[in-house]
């Protein structure tokens, strides 16, 4: 029997994502000037205020206020009527030195024996239902908001958009788990107060259905067949959405972990990513398991896979590695046997994850909105500034965990 599955996304202007982006901008700046920085940074944003708190061990000093303001400005909170504006918001920093008790569990005389920064379990997932090996409902949810942000910045076809927005896509699947069509789309977008409420809501719905949706179909032609005139659209279903962003809802780092990962498919160990340097396995091991999952599916080992890894704080070797293929395995091995091969191919000690995926680089700001997974690897040049006139220009590789660079190794190991 056919069934429905739903995933959601939030825009870069959503208050929780504003917090994530500030936290990750701080991570990038610390790593740019001191690649061995240990950082855990949490951000709270609310009406006219930003509060930074966390623990740092680093040889660099940063102007954290300026970094936060630049992030807020880039997102688009640049007008006083938003009640949260880059130049005027207050910024309080309570960032302090990392606990020596925690640091002793990570630092080792031998780099290779670097301990995990915490206990916990992390998951990576991949499926062949999309070209980027991501769940389709989440991919579409992200795509809607990326294009909505493009429309906002162009300020041409739609002129009233504000930064805060959410999306949700419901797909109908067939008995054999193949996506058939889009059943429902929900979009809530913040907007200017430009007319009577009923008039505004009617125009917003008309504009999104007649402008945004055709742009999505043109930009993602592989999804065009899923759109038809039977889709139920819920556009700003609660009514007008003028008050939004951090003024409408307080935002916190790490509150959108399902949006960040697989949209409810697979599993999640509970640890957030943003604001954490790669010694925190919540982040680095989640990237590493995604890398494993994607390469196994791309190699033809299975159609769908979930990879779990777990750690004890201060211990380098994982306490477990487990694989679930949901009955889609193409090789004559049990999931337990596949797990053993994965363990032999991929060294999951924290230092080796950092080296394999080049994680001690300032690569995290780009992850903090529209998902950490399913993105396109690319090499970019970035320039950072610090007090005293210091600048640092670096070339870095983004989204290394999305590379299909182990496909041949996997095929050889599995004899295919």
Curated annotation (Swiss-Prot):
It is found in: Cytoplasm. L-methionine binds at residues 55, 98, 249, 280. GO terms for biological process: one-carbon metabolic process; S-adenosylmethionine biosynthetic process. ATP binds at residues 14, 164-166, 240-241, 249, 255-256, 272, 276. Pathway: Amino-acid biosynthesis; S-adenosyl-L-methionine biosynthesis; S-adenosyl-L-methionine from L-methionine: step 1/1. The keyword Endoplasmic reticulum does not apply. Pfam families: S-AdoMet_synt_C (PF02773), S-AdoMet_synt_M (PF02772), S-AdoMet_synt_N (PF00438). InterPro entries: ADOMET_SYNTHASE_CS (IPR022631), S-AdoMet_synt_C (IPR022630), S-AdoMet_synt_central (IPR022629), S-AdoMet_synt_N (IPR022628), S-AdoMet_synthetase (IPR002133), S-AdoMet_synthetase_sfam (IPR022636). Its EC number is 2.5.1.6. It comes from the Bacteria. One of its GO terms (cellular component) is cytoplasm. Residues 98-108 are annotated as: Flexible loop. One of its GO terms (molecular function) is methionine adenosyltransferase activity. CDD domains: S-AdoMet_synt. It is an enzyme of class 2 (transferase). Keywords: ATP-binding, Cytoplasm, Magnesium, Metal-binding, Nucleotide-binding, One-carbon metabolism, Potassium, Transferase. Binds 2 divalent ions per subunit. K(+) binds at residue 42. Its cofactor is Mg(2+); K(+). It catalyses: L-methionine + ATP + H2O = S-adenosyl-L-methionine + phosphate + diphosphate. Belongs to the AdoMet synthase family. Homotetramer; dimer of dimers. PANTHER family: S-ADENOSYLMETHIONINE SYNTHETASE. NCBIfam families: metK. Catalyzes the formation of S-adenosylmethionine (AdoMet) from methionine and ATP. The overall synthetic reaction is composed of two sequential steps, AdoMet formation and the subsequent tripolyphosphate hydrolysis which occurs prior to release of AdoMet from the enzyme. This is S-adenosylmethionine synthase. It comes from Flavobacterium psychrophilum (strain ATCC 49511 / DSM 21280 / CIP 103535 / JIP02/86). The lineage of its organism: Bacteria, Pseudomonadati, Bacteroidota, Flavobacteriia, Flavobacteriales. The gene is metK.
């Amino acid at each position: 029997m056919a069934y429905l599955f739903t995933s959601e996304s939030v825009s870069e202007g959503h208050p929780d994502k504003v917090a994530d982006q500030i936290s990750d901008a701080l991570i990038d700046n610390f790593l740019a000037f001191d690649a061995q920085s240990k950082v855990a940074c949490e951000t709270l944003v609310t009406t006219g205020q930003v509060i930074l708190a966390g623990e740092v061990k680093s040889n660099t000093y940063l102007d954290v206020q300026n970094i936060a303001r630049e992030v807020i400005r880039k997102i688009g909170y640049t007008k006083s009527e938003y009640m949260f504006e880059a130049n005027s918001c207050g910024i309080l920093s309570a960032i302090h030195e990392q606990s020596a008790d925690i640091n002793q569990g990570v630092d080792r005389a031998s780099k290779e024996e670097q301990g995990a920064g915490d206990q916990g379990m992390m998951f990576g997932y991949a499926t062949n239902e999309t070209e980027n090996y991501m769940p389709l409902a989440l991919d579409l949810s992200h795509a809607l908001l990326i294009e909505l942000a493009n429309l906002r910045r162009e300020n041409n076809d739609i002129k009233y958009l504000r930064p805060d927005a959410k999306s949700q896509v419901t797909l109908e699947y067939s008995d054999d788990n193949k996506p058939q069509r889009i059943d429902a789309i929900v979009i809530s977008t913040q907007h200017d107060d430009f007319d009577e409420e009923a008039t505004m809501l009617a125009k917003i719905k008309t504009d999104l259905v007649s402008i945004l949706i055709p742009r999505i179909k043109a930009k993602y032609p592989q999804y065009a067949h899923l759109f038809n005139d039977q889709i139920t659209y819920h556009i700003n279903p609660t009514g007008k959405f003028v008050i939004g962003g951090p003024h409408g809802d307080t935002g916190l780092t790490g509150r959108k972990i399902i949006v960040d990962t697989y949209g409810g498919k697979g599993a999640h160990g509970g640890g957030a990513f943003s604001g954490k340097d790669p010694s925190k396995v919540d982040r680095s091991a989640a990237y590493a398991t995604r890398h494993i999952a994607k390469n196994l599916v791309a190699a033809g080992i299975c159609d769908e896979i979930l990879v779990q890894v777990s750690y004890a704080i201060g211990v380098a070797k994982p306490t477990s590695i487990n694989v679930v293929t949901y009955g889609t395995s193409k090789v004559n091995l049990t999931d337990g046997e596949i797990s053993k091969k994965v363990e032999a191919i991929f060294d999951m000690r924290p230092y080796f994850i950092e080296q394999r995926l080049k994680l001690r680089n300032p690569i995290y700001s780009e992850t903090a909105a529209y998902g950490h997974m399913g993105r396109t690897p690319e090499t970019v040049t970035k320039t950072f500034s610090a007090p005293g006139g210091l600048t640092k220009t670096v070339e870095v590789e983004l989204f290394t965990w999305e590379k299909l660079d182990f496909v041949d190794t996997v095929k050889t190991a599995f004899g295919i």
